[in-house]
Amino acid sequence: MAAQTSIRRKLRARRKVRIAAGERPRLSVFRSSKHIYAQIIDDKNGTTLAAASSAVVKAGNKTDTAAAVGKALAEAASAKGVKQVVFDRGQYKYHGRVKALADAAREGGLDF
């Protein structure tokens, strides 16, 4: 039952991202039990514009580390000239580490 809910949530989120994407690159989030990874992907060209992960960035607990990853990603994106993205949370709820990463990316200058 939990797996079906997760799959439905993922498909619902992806559908919304596809509709909203248009001309904007996608900020994709992957969360494991130890780390969190985020990358900005240009789906038209199939290239990764910027990436950051907690394997490189460390800061206190998992939520603080996720916020540091969001800030690092925003800095890398602004260096490449990316200001607007579509947030792709995947199957993860917008809560905890995912929310901390998104909030820090917004504070860093990304618009979504």
Swiss-Prot record:
Subunit = Part of the 50S ribosomal subunit; part of the 5S rRNA/L5/L18/L25 subcomplex. Contacts the 5S and 23S rRNAs.
Q: Which domain of life is it from?
A: Bacteria
What this chain does, per the record? Answer: This is one of the proteins that bind and probably mediate the attachment of the 5S RNA into the large ribosomal subunit, where it forms part of the central protuberance.
Which keywords belong to this entry?
A: Ribonucleoprotein, Ribosomal protein, RNA-binding, rRNA-binding
Q: Identify the species of origin.
A: Deinococcus deserti (strain DSM 17065 / CIP 109153 / LMG 22923 / VCD115)
Q: Which family does it belong to?
A: Belongs to the universal ribosomal protein uL18 family.
Q: What GO terms fall under cellular component here?
A: cytosolic large ribosomal subunit
**One of the protein's GO biological processes:** translation
Task: Work out whether the entry's keyword set contains RNA-binding.
Answer: yes
Q: Which gene encodes it?
A: rplR
Matches recorded under Pfam families: Ribosomal_L18p
Its protein name is Large ribosomal subunit protein uL18
User: What Gene Ontology molecular-function terms does this entry list?
Assistant: 5S rRNA binding; structural constituent of ribosome
Gene3D superfamilies this protein is in? 3.30.420.100
Q: Would I find Cell division among this entry's keywords? A: no
Supply the PANTHER family for this chain.
Answer: 39S RIBOSOMAL PROTEIN L18, MITOCHONDRIAL (PTHR12899), LARGE RIBOSOMAL SUBUNIT PROTEIN UL18M (PTHR12899:SF3)
Classification lineage: Bacteria, Thermotogati, Deinococcota, Deinococci, Deinococcales
